[in-house]
């Protein structure tokens, strides 16, 4: 690791102008590119107290061996140069939104002499037009099946095409009319390309001419009594309608917009983008990236809270995504020009693609950090005005919320995929063992969290993970009694109370029946023993690792309880607001886990689960308290009689004004119960 003080620029040598900077490692490779309104202010942050830096930023600064910068005239130029350098150097510490290789697409090989349509996953290739991406592989295949009803074109691979060309007879699709069989000369290459052009035009949204043409042919066939042909054309219309249903109208006709939403935590961020063209969703894409640099946050992002790093995430994404899109569009235009020079009019019926890469509207959750500068850069790329904004109401707001839900689901599925990976779970437990100096991997981990609002309804959760997976049957919930009440709350005391209640019978729970005693146990005695064990199952397995919510004070409180109870065989740690900081009893400094480690991901999962259970229980208790009534404590008064009383008098206030005789008139109430209710209501 390099020493940042050795390459720190001399005081006063960094300009205060806007610019772009590069960190290089000892081999002169660029490892991070950033931009700044004020280079001196930004770069100085990297050379302050290194322990205060975000872990990934700290790793970058320690990996670097030098820093250099370039001054530019404006913040807009800084944005453009930053993107150029990121593309050129591919720095390891920058967030890169690369094409998602997992999404299936419909591809058309326009560069071939006899183009074909096919299902495709992978990086984009020259001479191929792509449509999608689609959410599922079956959606591509279904679309391709419907498209070949209307546009019978080649879908086979080169080997299949060559074989049937040699045989002189078409494949099955050629016989059933889903391919125009250019392999045997049924149509010329020019006629086949005309069919391909019509398909591309249709997929670009130009559906009306195709529908009109098929409808006209169907009516003509019916007039000429060609009912079999008319029926087939009717089915073709049905296929067109089904294809259009897959791109349902979600916004007014003529609306061209991209809707972008993020879902993030302190480690990763998922982004989803919906492409809406002429009011229909034409495509959807998604990525999950590790947060770093300006987009990283060190604090826990609570559910429902605004992510402070969101504007930086959005800004980085907009510049990268649309710059890449325009560059790709230019490459496709250059390929089209080459084909045209060869005398191939491969898109005479297609919609013009100029300007399609960046729509007129870009709808986001929050404006980017430097909204005006980003807008200028995007307008230069598009060559026309654009509107980057946050929709506040109506259909656009509703659709953006749908995009956000997709992003949340994507992040959730990404986490579940990691949780379900046995190798990743094993690595996480091994990393925890090494980081905490444990004798063995913590196969059973328990984590507690406190939840309350201004000292009311203070509760705690205790979640249990075994082999890295939740064991929900062992979860426990506590109402804090000693450390809270009357609107007061003591988080440190609450942690101590939960720890004491959890481990009060720790030594008793560990006792087992000796083997020699078991040998002389009858079947009946064994059944009684098993039944008793099942009733105390929740506490019968002590954890190897116990995690408390909080930093050094909370850990010290839990350790005091451990000392009081004589517990020495359970490792204790605390998770502070900075997730990667793991506090160990007696240590002045926290243990720092690598940000991309499986151990940190497991701790995040534990903390989130404990937080979820605590919040849920707190809401339940708060709701129960708000529904409670002064009648709940009246002895002998059940739910039905309480309801009858309130229904009879209209409210508790009017009930208090009633006499014993009036209460006794209510059905089911005698003089004795009426007197009890009256005395209870007027006891104060």
UniProtKB/Swiss-Prot annotation:
Domain of life: Bacteria
Biased composition (Basic and acidic residues): 332-352
Domain named GIY-YIG: residues: 16-95
PROSITE patterns reported for this sequence: GIY_YIG, UVR, UVRC
Ranges for region Disordered: 332-357
Entry's Gene Ontology cellular component terms: cytoplasm; excinuclease repair complex
Compartments (UniProt record): Cytoplasm
SMART domains: GIYc, HhH1
Domain UVR stretches: 208-243
Keywords: Cytoplasm, DNA damage, DNA excision, DNA repair, Excision nuclease, SOS response
One Pfam entry name: UvrC_RNaseH
Gene Ontology molecular function terms on file: DNA binding; excinuclease ABC activity
Any one of the GO BP annotations: SOS response
InterPro entries listed in its UniProt record: GIY-YIG_endonuc, GIY-YIG_endonuc_sf, GIY-YIG_UvrC_Cho, Hlx-hairpin-Hlx_DNA-bd_motif, RuvA_2-like, UVR_dom, UVR_dom_sf, UvrABC_protein_C
Subunit structure: Interacts with UvrB in an incision complex.
Record family assignment: Belongs to the UvrC family.
Function according to Swiss-Prot or TrEMBL: The UvrABC repair system catalyzes the recognition and processing of DNA lesions. UvrC both incises the 5' and 3' sides of the lesion. The N-terminal half is responsible for the 3' incision and the C-terminal half is responsible for the 5' incision.
The name this protein goes by in its record: UvrABC system protein C
Record organism: Corynebacterium aurimucosum (strain ATCC 700975 / DSM 44827 / CIP 107346 / CN-1) (Corynebacterium nigricans)
């Amino acid at each position: 690791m390099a020493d940042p003080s050795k390459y720190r620029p001399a005081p006063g040598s960094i300009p205060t102008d806007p610019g772009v900077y590069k960190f290089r490692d000892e081999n002169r490779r660029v490892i991070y590119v950033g931009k700044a309104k004020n280079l001196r202010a930004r770069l100085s942050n990297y050379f302050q107290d290194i322990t205060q830096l975000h872990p990934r930023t700290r790793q970058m600064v320690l990996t670097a061996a030098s820093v250099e910068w370039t001054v530019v005239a404006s913040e807009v130029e800084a944005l453009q140069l930053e993107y150029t350098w990121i593309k050129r150097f591919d720095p390891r510490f920058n967030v890169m939104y690369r094409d998602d290789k997992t999404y299936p697409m419909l591809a058309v090989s326009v560069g071939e002499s006899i183009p074909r349509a096919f299902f495709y996953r992978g990086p984009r290739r020259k001479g191929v037009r792509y449509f999608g991406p689609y959410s599922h592989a079956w959606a591509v295949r279904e679309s391709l099946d419907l498209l070949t009803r209307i546009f019978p074109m080649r879908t086979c691979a080169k080997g299949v095409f060559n074989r049937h060309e040699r045989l002189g007879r078409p494949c099955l699709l050629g016989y059933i009319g889903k391919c125009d069989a250019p392999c045997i000369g049924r149509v010329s290459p020019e006629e086949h390309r005309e069919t391909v052009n019509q398909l591309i035009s249709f997929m670009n949204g130009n559906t009306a001419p195709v529908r009109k043409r098929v409808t006209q042919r169907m009516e003509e066939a019916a007039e000429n009594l060609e009912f079999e042909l008319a029926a087939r054309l009717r089915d073709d219309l049905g296929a067109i309608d089904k294809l259009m249903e897959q791109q349902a109208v979600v916004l007014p006709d003529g609306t061209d917009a991209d809707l972008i939403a993020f879902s993030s935590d302190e480690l990763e961020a998922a982004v989803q983008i919906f492409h809406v063209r002429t009011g229909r969703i034409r495509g959807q894409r998604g990525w999950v990236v590790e947060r770093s640099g300006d987009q990283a946050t060190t604090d826990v992002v609570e559910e429902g809270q605004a992510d402070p790093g969101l504007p930086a995430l959005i800004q980085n994404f907009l510049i990268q995504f649309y710059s890449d899109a325009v560059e790709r569009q230019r490459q496709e235009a250059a390929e089209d020009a080459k084909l045209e020079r060869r005398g191939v009019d491969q898109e005479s019926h297609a919609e013009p693609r100029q300007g399609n890469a960046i729509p007129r509207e870009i709808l986001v959750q929050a404006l980017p950090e430097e909204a005006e500068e980003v807008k200028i850069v995007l307008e230069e790329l598009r060559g026309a005005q654009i509107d980057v904004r946050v929709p506040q109401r109506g259909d656009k707001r509703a659709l953006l919320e749908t995009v956000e839900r997709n992003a949340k689901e994507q992040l959730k599925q990404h986490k579940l995929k990691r949780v379900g990976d046995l190798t990743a779970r094993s690595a996480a437990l091994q990393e925890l063992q090494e980081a905490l100096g444990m004798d063995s991997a913590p196969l059973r981990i328990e984590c507690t969290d406190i939840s309350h609002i201004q000292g009311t309804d203070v509760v705690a959760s205790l979640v249990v993970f075994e082999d890295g997976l939740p064991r929900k049957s062992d979860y426990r919930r506590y109402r804090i009694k000693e450390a809270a009440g009357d609107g007061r709350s003591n988080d440190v005391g609450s942690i101590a109370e939960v720890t004491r209640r959890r481990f009060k019978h720790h030594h008793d729970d560990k006792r087992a029946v000796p083997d020699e005693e078991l040998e002389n146990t009858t079947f009946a005695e064994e059944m009684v023993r098993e039944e008793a064990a099942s009733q105390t199952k929740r506490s019968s397995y002590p954890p190897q690792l116990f995690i408390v919510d909080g930093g050094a004070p909370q850990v010290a409180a839990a350790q005091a309880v451990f000392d009081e109870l004589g517990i020495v065989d359970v490792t204790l740690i605390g998770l502070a607001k900075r997730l990667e900081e793991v506090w160990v009893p007696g240590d002045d400094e926290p243990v720092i886990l690598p940000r991309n480690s499986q151990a940190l991901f497991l701790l995040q999962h534990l903390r989130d689960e404990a937080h979820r259970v605590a919040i849920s229980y707190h809401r339940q208790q708060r709701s129960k308290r708000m529904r409670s009534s002064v009648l709940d404590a009246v002895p002998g008064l059940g739910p039905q009689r309480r309801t009858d009383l309130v229904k009879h008098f209209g409210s508790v206030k009017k009930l208090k004004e009633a006499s014993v005789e009036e209460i006794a008139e209510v059905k089911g109430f005698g003089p004795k119960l009426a007197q009890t209710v009256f005395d209870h209501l007027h006891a104060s």
